Amino acid sequence: MGKRIDDETLKKIRLPKEGEIFGVVEKMLGNDRVQVRCVDGKTRVARIPGKMRKRVWIREGDVVLVKPWEFQPERADVTWRYTRVQVDWLKRKGKLDERVTKLLEEIIPGA
């Protein structure tokens, strides 16, 4: 059975903090790394931190928040993964950048 999401859960959806940007997972690279296409037009290799490794499963086409490294901007850390329901809610509320929707359609046609 699917999970039921209520309004209170949706209100707790995490929005980007300073230094974080939206991205879409293009490719799983292995060794807890993913290739993410970000809304700023760059493709980064993002690391999945230890606290997310076994708790949050990330797949190709998922919308994620990444925090680029200051000293190596072509790399980043994944800080959050959004579910499909959360992505739909963000689109309806206008919180999700239009560029993310375009990235989703490029990576997964018909998304």
Swiss-Prot record:
GO molecular function: RNA binding; translation initiation factor activity
Residues of the S1-like domain: 11-83
Pfam family, one: eIF-1a
Highest taxon, organism lineage: Archaea
Cross-referenced CDD domains: S1_IF1A
InterPro entries for this protein: NA-bd_OB-fold (IPR012340), RNA-binding_domain_S1_IF1 (IPR006196), TIF_eIF-1A (IPR001253), TIF_eIF-1A_CS (IPR018104)
Keyword Protein biosynthesis: yes
Keywords from the named record: Initiation factor, Protein biosynthesis
The keyword Transferase is annotated on this UniProt entry: no
Task of the protein: Seems to be required for maximal rate of protein biosynthesis. Enhances ribosome dissociation into subunits and stabilizes the binding of the initiator Met-tRNA(I) to 40 S ribosomal subunits.
Family annotation (PANTHER family): EIF-1A (PTHR21668)
Family named by the database record: Belongs to the eIF-1A family.
Protein name per Swiss-Prot or TrEMBL: Translation initiation factor 1A
Species this protein is from: Methanopyrus kandleri (strain AV19 / DSM 6324 / JCM 9639 / NBRC 100938)
Name of the gene this protein is made from: eIF1A
